[in-house]
């Protein structure tokens, strides 16, 4: 059962020391009334902010001078206790302006030639190195907070491995006799340092109460280093759609978090853009959608706000949050304490690729997830520790070469009847350029041409055969006798565009003959000879999406657990609530539109009509109804397939199948 409260607010309070009269307008009743209006059952309040200011009388840090002795944190905690609202405590770990002003030598330095780790556009905030004496100070601050307040949870912010070249890190490398010119030595040290930090801070958090929750926030849960997730007692998936994460980041993050066995929540914001935006509001419909989306993935919710320095709560903000959480309160019983169902497993490039990704927006992972979301597939995201049991198809997007360890694991999976879909260089050995599985093809190298063309044997969108341009890297394959089907062909252009030879505005047209197979099938699955996931992430090419979907459909056949005619901007989950003897299909739909300079906005929530759902369940279904209003839905069940039709819904619906 759930331990984390389900409707939380993360109340930022990063407040400059140059502002006076801090908390002067704090009013306990107004604070409580806003929490009630917001349907909030937990609020994270501040002990220490990024500026290094403490919001209670502290012996280990600098109390904000503008408080003039007022213990704001204690006042907030008392207000929460009186109305039964949970109140974990926030401590800024990686940023502390006050400390760095006094100890500039403790700054983290990202490159040998730089003087600090740059965090644009947050001018003024600079990371502190955990190999400096600051870590002792931070630990003492945490110990003071838990001894004084005994909170149920501690949120430690700006905490993830950061490569650092400060004098403390250089000294460690030197003492170990390692090469200071080798960047990998500093990468390895950053991971070791983060573990040291986590071990010490976790011990401090639990020094009073071993059941105190702790979360270290780094803005993303890393599948590259999955062990780090377990430094936390739970996961808070920071994902502000308008703050740089985008609307498709949270579903990707939640699908991965669900595999780790920890409770998790989705963290969005009430802001039009991102953290620290005073006076910024998104449309209420956007926040309703984000709460519904979060809960549909089995996640609790947290909404970010920032309190005014004077300590009063913004009434409009809590009216906005209340609209979203009123809906969340109504649907949470059908979403939380559930297990997600899957047909497809995606091996994460972030975890499996030889080279680590350069950002959290890895094109190979982003592209394949977009295709699967838009195709309404049930899928999970897998790191190196994940089991492959139970998946009907495993997808290896673009750059997952096969180590001996992975080969052994995949062989076992294939022996049990599974199928593979590989794109790009996935499926090739790490030791030499050859396929390690039977896709009915031999690998012959990377194409010399870009772009190239795919000529499919299927009819994309009902169009007749043609040669469709693909801009991502293409790979040359040759058909083998074991090939069971060539599903598409590859064609080259007359030449690559150069100053010496070019044609028209873009690129040369295709030659009138095939280079060879573009998609091949063998006994182990299918291979697509382009970085097709990256193609979809970068260009949004409809042919790329259609190619992956059509290939998947041939592999999975009639074995899909659920089929639904939801539009491509929708999200679908199927969750099992075993203790309540039911399955719940969650359908969520809105269409973000870019407004301004790339900001995605949700304004209108469009009503959808005649949504048909077919679910294959092993149990006999007794009843089907809407979770939002408990109204009955007519259904049929034949050969295990339960068929039901929604005449209409707006934004979200939970379709409940009682067994």
What are these regions (language model features)?
Residues 36-72, 95-114, 118-121, 163, ...:
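Aromatic-lined carbohydrate-binding/catalytic grooves of carbohydrate-active enzymes
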Residues 12-14, 44-52, 91-98, 155-165, ...:
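Short, solvent-exposed turn/loop segments enriched in Gly/Ser/Thr/Pro and often Arg
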Residues 14-26, 124-137, 276-284:
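Active-site mouth loops of central-metabolism enzymes
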Residues 19-38, 59-83, 196, 402-406:
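Aromatic- and glycine-enriched glycan-recognition loops and surfaces
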Residues 1-53, 85:
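N-terminal structural segment of carbohydrate-active enzymes
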Residues 3-5, 37, 42, 66, ...:
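Carbohydrate-binding surfaces of carbohydrate-active enzymes
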Residues 1-18, 113-125, 260-275:
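N-terminal small/glycine-rich loop or linker at the start of catalytic domains
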Residues 89-149, 184-187, 198-199:
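Active-site-adjacent "subsite" loops/lids of carbohydrate-active enzymes
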């Amino acid at each position: 059962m759930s331990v984390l409260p389900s409707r939380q607010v993360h109340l930022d309070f990063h407040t400059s020391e140059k502002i006076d009269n801090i908390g002067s307008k704090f009013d306990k009743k107004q604070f409580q009334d806003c929490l009630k209006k917001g349907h909030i059952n937990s609020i994270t309040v501040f002990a220490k902010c990024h500026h290094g200011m403490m919001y209670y009388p502290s012996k280990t840090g600098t109390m904000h001078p503008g408080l003039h002795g007022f213990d704001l944190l204690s006042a907030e905690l008392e207000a929460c206790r009186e109305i039964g609202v949970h109140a974990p405590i926030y401590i800024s770990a990686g940023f502390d302006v006050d400390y760095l002003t006094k100890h500039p030598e403790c700054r983290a330095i990202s490159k040998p030639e730089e003087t600090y780790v740059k965090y644009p556009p947050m001018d003024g905030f600079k990371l502190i190195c955990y190999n400096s004496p600051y870590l002792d100070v931070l630990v003492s601050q945490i110990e003071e907070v838990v001894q004084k307040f005994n909170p149920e949870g501690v949120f430690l912010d700006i905490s993830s491995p950061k490569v650092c070249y400060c004098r403390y890190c250089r000294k460690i490398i030197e003492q170990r006799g390692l090469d200071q010119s080798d960047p990998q030595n500093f990468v390895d040290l950053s991971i070791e340092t983060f573990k040291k930090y986590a071990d010490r801070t976790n011990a401090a958090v639990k020094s009073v109460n071993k059941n105190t929750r702790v979360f270290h926030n780094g803005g993303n849960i890393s599948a590259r280093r999955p062990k780090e997730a377990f430094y936390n007692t739970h996961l808070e998936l920071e994902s502000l759609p308008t703050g740089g994460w985008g609307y498709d980041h949270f579903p990707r993050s939640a699908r991965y978090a669900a595999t780790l066995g920890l409770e998790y929540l989705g963290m969005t914001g009430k802001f039009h853009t991102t953290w620290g935006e005073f006076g910024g509001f998104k449309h209420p419909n956007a926040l309703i959608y984000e709460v519904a989306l979060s809960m549909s993935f089995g996640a609790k919710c947290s909404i970010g706000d920032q309190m005014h320095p004077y300590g009063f709560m913004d009434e409009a903000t809590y009216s906005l949050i209340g609209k979203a959480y009123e809906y969340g309160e109504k649907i949470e019983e059908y979403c939380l304490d559930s297990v997600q169902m899957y047909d497809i497993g995606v091996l994460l490039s972030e975890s499996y690729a030889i080279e680590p990704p350069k950002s959290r927006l890895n094109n190979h992972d982003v592209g394949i997830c977009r295709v699967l979301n838009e195709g309404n597939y049930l899928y999970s995201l897998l790191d190196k520790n994940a089991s492959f049991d139970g998946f009907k198809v495993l997808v290896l997007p673009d750059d997952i070469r096969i180590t001996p360890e992975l080969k052994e694991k995949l062989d076992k999976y294939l022996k049990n009847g599974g199928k593979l879909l590989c794109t790009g260089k996935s499926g090739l050995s790490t030791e030499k350029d050859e396929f390690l599985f039977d896709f009915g093809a031999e690998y012959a190298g990377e194409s010399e041409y870009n772009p190239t063309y795919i000529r499919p044997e299927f009819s994309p969108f009902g169009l007749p055969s043609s040669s469709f341009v693909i801009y991502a890297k293409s790979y040359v394959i040759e058909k083998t006798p074991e090939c069971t089907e060539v599903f598409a062909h590859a064609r080259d252009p007359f030449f690559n565009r150069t100053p010496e030879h070019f044609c028209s505005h873009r690129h040369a047209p295709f030659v009138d003959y095939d280079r060879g197979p573009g998609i091949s099938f063998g006994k182990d699955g299918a291979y697509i000879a382009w970085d097709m996931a990256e193609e979809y992430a970068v260009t949004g090419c409809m042919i790329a999406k259609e190619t992956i979907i059509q290939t998947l459909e041939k592999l999975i056949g009639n074995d899909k657990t659920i089929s639904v005619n939801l539009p491509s901007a929708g999200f679908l989950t199927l969750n099992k609530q075993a203790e309540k003897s039911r399955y719940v299909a969650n359908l969520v739909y809105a269409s973000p539109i870019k407004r301004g300079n790339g900001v995605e906005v949700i304004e209108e929530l469009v009503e959808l009509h005649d949504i048909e759902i077919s679910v294959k369940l092993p149990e006999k279904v007794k009843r089907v109804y809407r979770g939002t209003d408990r109204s009955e839905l007519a259904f049929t069940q034949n050969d295990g397939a339960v068929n039901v039709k929604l005449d209409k819904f707006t934004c979200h619906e939970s379709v409940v199948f009682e067994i």
